[in-house]
Structure formats: structure tokens, C-alpha cells
Amino acid sequence: MNPNKRLLSLDVLRGITVAGMILVNNTGKCGYNFAAFAHAKWDGFSPADLVFPMFMFLMGISTYISLCKYNFQCRPAIAKIIKRSLLLIFIGLVMEWFITSIDSGNYFDLSQLRLMGVMQRLGICYGITALLAVTIPHKRFMPLAIILLVVYFIFQLFGNGFEKSVDNIVGMIDSAILGANHMYLQGRQFVDPEGILSTIPAVSQVMIGFVCGKIIIDIKDNDRRMLNLFLIGTTLLFVGYLLSYACPLNKRLWSPSFVLLTCGIAALSLALLLYIIDVKQNKKWFSFFEAFGANPLVIYVFSCIAGGLLVHWHIHTAVFSNLLNPLFGNYFGSFMYGVFFLLFNGLLGYVLLKRKIYIKL
């Protein structure tokens, strides 16, 4: 496949994940979520837990595609890699500052600024994966990804790393390096879901996506391409499920079993969409998600800022309490708020797509 040609199935799957992230993060009222749109409180797995790791997996694929133009040579690619990684981290910090500031009303108080977050994790994991891509043979990627998962599992195994307690090594490292005030919810949940130690398995997530990106680009035959994705996805899903008996599925800890399971689901989902969209050319049913997937990071950042402003201006509460709750009730009304907010963000995506504007960070 030509790496300069946009892969519609990849855009669509990215769009599905971004739409899912917006729905999960923007409900009408906290606590009134359908189970599918609520994260597992600790151990366990729900559809809501899938969207972010799937996006990271897809970022691994995009990393392979974007570095093809540099032929994976370090010298020409290094400036782009560092610039993009730092930009993602910077945007994440600005977003955290903005949300914290409008809540407190103090735009100069950084004492409770969350240092890690979704964009920061994307920036760090992209940077590490991309630097590895231009410095080591790609055949070592999958073994290295597995080694990182094993190392993290050992940390968890011998550091009480599966328990929701103050002596969990994952949370202890987050607290020691970041400080409780700079963690998610000021450390009240013991660990930061995008924390320091759990970045290790998150890098593995992106690296596995990178391997699948190599399959998509290097294998020219669609049948072989889909077969390879299917085999990898099935293997990862099966191993992740088996491993979950010894290593619980846990998004907050980004456990090794969670990485393997979600990578498996992502690979199988992409194989299915490749068949439906790129082979069978059934595209018309997916244009809605393409609008989100063509500019995923722009839509995500916009949704976070817009969502924060709607809460700050009390529009969020007014719409839910005075309109959606009386019409639909607590749970469905809360869900409908997310749907309307999703459509609102989709307008931006639609305009950018129709004008063929693709904003790359």
C-alpha cells in the first residue's frame, strides 16, 4: 500500500474511538452512566475501557506510515519526532492548566496542575516508539514489546501492583515523582491512570500497533494483509484473556493482560473494517466516523475544551436538568447529552473533512 494514500478503514476506526472517548467523557450527570459507557472501577473490563488503548494502538500504525516517508532514517526524522512528541505533551499540559484554572478561577496557581494525562501519554509513547523505529530493526519490535510487558508485570507482582492501596508500587512511584497534588484527582485514587510506571505497557501498546502498521503497508495483497491482522489479533486476544486469570484486566494500571486484550480487539476490528470498506468498498455507512477520524486529535482537544467551558458556564447543568432529564430521565437523559455533544463536535470534523483540511500535530 502507498503510505501517502489515506486508508479509509484506519480513519473510520480512529473516528469510532474518538467518538467513543467523547461519549464516555461527556455525560449529562456523573453517576448516571449506562454500564457500557462507564469505566471499570478497578479490575474488570467494559467497552468504555477500550477506546483510549485502541487509539494508542492506531497511533502506532500511523507512526509506521508517517515514518515511511523518511525511510526510517534517524537523521531526517529526528527533528519531526521530537517536535511532535513535545507538542503533544505541551498541548496536554495546556489543556490540564485550562481545565484546572477555569474551575478554580486562578490562572496562575499551578499547585494542583495534573502533569500526566491523555495527550501527555500520547506524546511520550509516540516519541519513544518513533525513536526506536529509526534506531533498531523492526523485527525486534514485537519481542521488545513483550519484554516491556514482562518487566512491568514483575514490578506489579513484587510491588503489590494489583491492589487498590497506598502501597501499590504503581501509585507509590506516581506519588514520589509527580506528587499527589499533580496526579489525577490529586491522588485520591492512589494511582494516576496515565502515570509514570504504567507508561511502560502503554509504550508496548503503541509498538504492537506499529507492527500492524508494517503489515498494512508492506503486504500488498489484501487477503494476506487481513489474514495476518486476524492471526495477530486472535493470538493477542486469546493470550490476554488467559493471562487475565493471573494478571487482572485493569485500565487504571494498564495491566499487561489489558494491553494484549485491547490490542487483539483493535487488530481484529481493523481487519474487519479493511474487508468491509477497502475491499468491498462499502463506505457510505461510515462517513459519520470518518469526520472524527480524519482529524482525531483536533476533535479530541476541541471536545475537552468545549466540554470544560459548558460545565464552567453552567450550560451543561441547565441542558441536562431543564431539558434532557425531564424528557428522558436520569440515565437516558445523561446519555443523550453525550450524543448531542458528540454531534456538536462532529460539525467541526465534517467541515474540516469536506474542505479536505487535515491538521497534523
Residue ranges, per PLM feature:
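Alpha-helical transmembrane segments and their immediate juxtamembrane cytosolic regions
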Residues: M1-L361
